[in-house]
UniProtKB/Swiss-Prot annotation:
Catalytic activity: L-methionyl-tRNA(fMet) + (6R)-10-formyltetrahydrofolate = N-formyl-L-methionyl-tRNA(fMet) + (6S)-5,6,7,8-tetrahydrofolate + H(+)
UniProt-recorded name of the protein: Methionyl-tRNA formyltransferase
Protein family per UniProt: Belongs to the Fmt family.
Gene: fmt
Chain's role: Attaches a formyl group to the free amino group of methionyl-tRNA(fMet). The formyl group appears to play a dual role in the initiator identity of N-formylmethionyl-tRNA by promoting its recognition by IF2 and preventing the misappropriation of this tRNA by the elongation apparatus.
Protein biosynthesis among keywords: yes
């Protein structure tokens, strides 16, 4: 099939790569405009654009899609069979969705109708889910509400964080996408409507969600740290500065001391903090304007002592 691919970040790269290597023909890629990134605010292309250009695939980067007649005309001239959308970053208007022969499908990183919206992977980890998944659905006007072609389930383990789960879902999504496209082309697949009454929404992550409330349970804080490891990172006040908690481990349920209190120093592993329920062994941290370091190095370098508090 002649495919136009819509996607922007790393999550979309796996699906584009799979399509390029498949029997389908990627006739164009639509992605977000290049944006300034990092401390130096250097303008950088989206990861999807980098891959597309490597394979000499035409790339469109419209500032806006709705009402963009020039883009619509260019896409129409490509005579696409289907549009594939993976984390493009903007909602597509109906005239675009309905342009191709087989309309438009989307790779979404949740078990729909759970976690429609922008941050399904983060929310699944933060809310302590034991499983998530990826679905291929038809795009409709309403956000993530289209009929579902196929889904695959993936367990969430305590070893997972936002990075590992993101990568697993991106890979599984790419495989499922190819399988779905083959079945659509052969007419071997039926769409199933979502149960809209069961729909939940994964709103975008806000910076302040990184702030740790030590009165919460060890399990809740552990999930927060894993989910927000890339951005904004879980953080807490310590002494007269802010410290980011990058890795931790639940060690036991007994209580000693106040929430936020450092109750034990484990020289080669880090330091133990009491929470509202249970304790956390802090294993990796980051101080302002510094690189991430092991909590054991932080104990030595910053002379962290029992009885000090994170707040």
């Amino acid at each position: 099939m002649r495919v136009v691919f819509w996607g922007t970040p790393d999550f979309a790269v796996e699906s584009l790569k799979a399509l390029i290597e498949s029997k389908h023909q990627v006739v164009a890629v639509v992605t977000q405009p290049d944006k300034p990134k990092g401390r130096g605010k250097k303008v950088q292309p989206p990861p999807v654009k980098v891959l597309a250009e490597k394979y000499s695939i035409p790339v469109f980067q419209p500032e806006k899609v709705k009402g963009n007649k020039e883009l619509y005309q260019k896409l129409k001239e490509l005579e696409p069979d289907i549009f594939v959308v993976v984390a493009y970053g903007k909602i597509l208007p109906e005239e675009i969705i309905n342009l191709p022969k087989y309309k438009t499908v989307n790779v979404h990183a949740s078990l729909l109708p759970e976690y429609r919206g922008a941050a399904p992977i983060h929310r699944a980890i933060m809310e302590g889910k034991e499983k998530t998944g990826v679905c291929i659905m038809e795009i409709v006007k309403e956000l993530d509400a289209g009929d579902i072609y196929q889904c695959v389930e993936i367990p969430i383990t305590d070893q997972d964080d936002i990075v590992s789960l993101h990568d697993k879902l991106a890979k599984e999504g790419a495989k499922l996408l190819l399988d779905t496209l083959d079945k659509i082309e052969k007419g071997e697949i039926k769409k199933v409507p979502q149960d809209h009454e069961r729909a939940t929404y994964a709103k975008p992550i806000e910076k302040e969600e990184g702030r740790i409330d030590w009165k919460r349970s060890a399990r809740e804080i552990f999930n927060q740290v894993r989910a927000l490891k890339v951005w904004p990172k879980a953080f807490s006040n310590f002494r007269d500065t802010q410290i980011k908690i990058l890795e931790c481990e639940i060690i036991d349920e007994r209580s000693e001391g106040e929430p936020g209190e450092i109750v034990k120093i484990m020289k080669d592993e880090g330091f133990v903090v009491q929470t509202g329920k249970g304790k956390l062994l802090i294993k990796k941290v980051q101080f302002p304007n510094s690189k991430p370091i092991s909590a054991a190095d932080a104990v030595r370098g910053y002379r962290i002592k029992e009885g000090e508090k994170l707040f």
